Amino acid sequence: MDKVQYLTRSAIRRASTIEMPQQARQNLQNLFINFCLILICLLLICIIVMLL
């Protein structure tokens, strides 16, 4: 278990030390925001359908 935690921690550290280009980070943020908006819309549609 400790080994798994250590591997996970080192992987996270390695991922955070890799400097992402600004454009890639921007694209990831846009993707994440779009994904969240789509999820919220789906939830709203489900709620409306249940209420009707």
Swiss-Prot record:
Tissues expressing the protein: Heart.
Membrane topology according to the record: Single-pass membrane protein
Lipidation (S-palmitoyl cysteine): C36
InterPro entries, per the entry: PLB
Phosphothreonine PTM positions: T17
One Pfam entry name: Phospholamban
Predominant subcellular localization, coarse grouping: endoplasmic reticulum
The protein, known as: Phospholamban
Gene: PLN
